[in-house]
Amino acid sequence: MGKRKQIKDGDVSMGGTDPATGDSSDEDIDMVNVDFEWFDPQEIDFHGIKHLIRQLFDVDAQDLDLSGLTDMILAQPLLGSTVKTDGKDSDPYAFLTVLNLQEHADKPPIKSLTTYIKRKASGTPSLSPLAQLFSQTPIPPIGLILTERLINMPSEVVPPMYAMLQEEITWAIEEKEPYNFSHYLIVSKTYEEVESKLDAEDSRPQKKKKKAGQEKGERFFFHPEDEVLERHALCKGGYEYEHKHDEGHSDSKRAFQELGIRTAGSLILIEAGRFEGAVKEMAEYLSPQQ
């Protein structure tokens, strides 16, 4: 049985969604009502979760031990959730979990990940509070939240995952397990629109004048809930990936009018005392429109 059969009493419409706004267009989109089920992570989810972690860290995923991280997630099956549509043996379309960075500090997958995060935080002024926490010995009991979903998944599946995670953490603490966190760190990703390289090749001289003003574009969220989480953050910031995408990658993502996109990493640090309020506001923000 799933953890929870459906979101409240209704089905969720699954169709084309603009990651920039979370809005879906009525034009040329077939909407399908889907029943989503939530499950504890299980061994059969290994490849699905590993794929989603790779998607989360984008091009920098090659520097991390994805298999090791996935094994750690599956080793705590009573914490976190997967979302599926065809029973517990089907592939996960989304997942959410939390890992204790202090408890697992000496494990190789966490060592490489914390080194990566510390490097990014140290190079981003707005993330200096996070860099300071990571410089402490031992590192504080920070709960690292890893969550990702397929690109066309509705954001309404997210609040139940966070709500169940809060319940599971409470139960774990009652059982004296090491999940009494001081902070929560959410790893995410953003994007900005960029001029198409294909268009640039054909552009006329006067068109190039626009480029200077477009060097730093507006930042958009892949995960709409990040907009709410950032409002509750002790610190937040974006960073460039260490590895570069192949030439033409932005054009392969041309889902936004005539523009391509450039992706970037994002870190959101929330004090534990503010986490419940953040989750509550997120649920209100992402609640289905009546």
From Swiss-Prot:
- What GO terms describe the biological role, i.e. biological process, of this protein? protein transport
Return the GO cellular component terms, semicolon-separated. Answer: cytoplasm; nucleus
The UniProt entry, under InterPro entries, shows: BCP1_family
Q: Where is this chain's protein located in or outside the cell?
A: Cytoplasm; Nucleus
Q: Where is this region: Disordered?
A: 1-27, 197-217
Per UniProt, the keywords (alphabetical) are: Cytoplasm, Nucleus, Protein transport, Transport
Per the record, the domain of life is: Eukaryota
**Family the entry assigns:** Belongs to the BCP1 family.
- Purpose of the protein: Involved in nuclear export, actin cytoskeleton organization and vesicular transport.
The name of this protein is: Protein bcp1
Which organism does this record belong to? Answer: Emericella nidulans (strain FGSC A4 / ATCC 38163 / CBS 112.46 / NRRL 194 / M139) (Aspergillus nidulans)
